[in-house]
């Protein structure tokens, strides 16, 4: 298992709130919590940037982190990530912040310590552009946006 440096910026983490951990041996994501001082009412259509109380330094250029929504918040309450997916580069060392957006019709209260997103560590391949005049023909060609059908 890879090791990633993490700084605890909020003393409640590891005390009142558990450290992020994988729930099962098959879990891909680590839950991130809202390190708030008081409950936050998120009105319909409102976005807020929430602190997680953690800073990470992945360091390995072959890795990055993705911050993804928790399925229950979006499906049951309409609360999703404001930027849909967050990308944490390997050389970033600041606090992890989570943008949340209430796309639902009702106000939603986020409690201090509530799990608001999940972080997944993913491999990264950097590519270099090779400028060409034409591509080698493929079966698909330039077909996109529904080109392959629905069924």
Swiss-Prot record:
Coiled coil: none annotated. Gene3D superfamilies: 2.70.40.10. Keywords: Hydrolase, Magnesium, Metal-binding, Nucleotide metabolism. Its EC number is 3.6.1.23. It comes from the Bacteria. GO terms for molecular function: dUTP diphosphatase activity; magnesium ion binding. It catalyses: dUTP + H2O = dUMP + diphosphate + H(+). InterPro entries: dUTPase, dUTPase-like, dUTPase-like_sf, dUTPase_trimeric. Its cofactor is Mg(2+). The keyword Hydrolase applies. Belongs to the dUTPase family. This enzyme is involved in nucleotide metabolism: it produces dUMP, the immediate precursor of thymidine nucleotides and it decreases the intracellular concentration of dUTP so that uracil cannot be incorporated into DNA. This is Deoxyuridine 5'-triphosphate nucleotidohydrolase. The gene is dut.
């Amino acid at each position: 298992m890879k090791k990633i440096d993490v700084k605890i910026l909020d003393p409640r983490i590891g005390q009142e709130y558990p450290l992020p951990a994988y729930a099962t041996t098959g879990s891909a994501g680590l839950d991130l919590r809202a390190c708030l001082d008081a409950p936050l009412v998120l009105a319909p259509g409102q976005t807020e940037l929430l602190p997680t109380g953690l800073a990470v330094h992945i360091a390995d250029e072959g890795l990055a982190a993705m911050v993804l929504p928790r399925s229950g918040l979006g499906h049951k309450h309409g609360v999703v990530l404001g930027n849909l997916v967050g990308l944490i580069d390997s050389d970033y060392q600041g606090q992890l912040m989570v943008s949340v957006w209430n796309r639902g019709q009702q106000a939603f209260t986020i409690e201090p310590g509530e799990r608001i997103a999940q972080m997944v560590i993913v491999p990264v391949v950097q590519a270099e552009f090779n400028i060409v005049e034409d591509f080698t023909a493929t079966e698909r060609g330039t077909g996109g946006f529904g080109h392959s059908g629905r069924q």
